[in-house]
Amino acid sequence: MPSNLNIVKVTKPQEENKNFLHKNTNEPNEMEQSQTQEAVTENFTENSNLSANEHAARRGRLNLKTVDHIETYPIVQETEEIAKKIALTRIILAQTKPRIDKVVVSRPVQAVAPVVNFFDKMANSTLSTVERVVPSLKTKTYKRLGEEIALPYTLSKKYGKQLRDTTARNGDNYVYQPVHGRLMKFRKYYNEKFIDTKGKPLIRGQLDPVLLPVNNTFEKVTVKYLPKGKKVPNDSFSCEFNRGLALEYNFMTRAVSAVSHQVVGIAKLPIAYGYHTNSVYNKNLDKQADLKMKNVLRGTWDTITDLEREIWASVTDRSLFRFFGNKSEGGDLPHLVQ
């Protein structure tokens, strides 16, 4: 009997293992999941420890919790990302950051670390209090900031459009429609009693043979040179005189839109060129081993050479600033001048 019991004790785990191996392989392995979670936790802890060690190496006994607190704000993080893409900022940080780190860990600064930490703690507490009063500090971004700055313009535009629409609707309902209705009744009356003008105005309708080719030519020229705009319907006017007025109004709206677009494009030209210059500068800085002054001067000279070559190439093939319409390696440039 004891030997049988021993056999049962040995074979039972084997059967359980066999059943476990024959389970559906699509089901997640709890042991693997736990190991993965532990690995992720260890990596996160390791990264946190590395970050803390880096701060300790750079700051010594200084805590500077206020600085760390401010760096958690989205708008500050966005500012840092923008600054990293500006060539001049990269150069300034590369030249000053090592010196600042040396000053921070120097003996005179470390000697007054307790005093600095005391005021830093007070400043951090004050910042936490401000966050409770103004919680939007934790979520503020440049996009939201721009929306808040543009809020007066957005509201004035919205309610201005509502006012214009209401005024136009009231004018149509209470002025144009009653007057136009009486004119149509009078026209119907003299068409029946005196002269049949076939629904056209008595005087303006006589000008149709002259105005029809003029209106057609004017419409073709407008669409050819000012393509952006709504098309004027041909079958919704009682005479060519009225259609001509609509074509003139359509021409003015298209012209204003085209001129404003060109003005905006020309106004953006210096910004676009500055953006292009920064992209070329960053590309040449990335080619250097580091951002020491010698390599910075070399990258600056290469940038000046590249920009000069671009301008001369644009002048010689009579396409000055055509490269604004192309994509730069640093990002998309506005399509300004062709």
UniProtKB/Swiss-Prot annotation:
It holds the Pfam family Perilipin_2. Keywords: Meiosis, Sporulation. Residues 22-37 have a biased composition (Polar residues). One of its GO terms (biological process) is ascospore formation. The keyword Nucleotidyltransferase does not apply. Residues 14-37 are annotated as: Disordered. Coiled coil: none annotated. GO terms for cellular component: lipid droplet. Signal peptide: none annotated. Not essential for sporulation. Might be a component of the cell wall. This is Sporulation-specific protein 4. It comes from Saccharomyces cerevisiae (strain ATCC 204508 / S288c). The gene is SPS4.
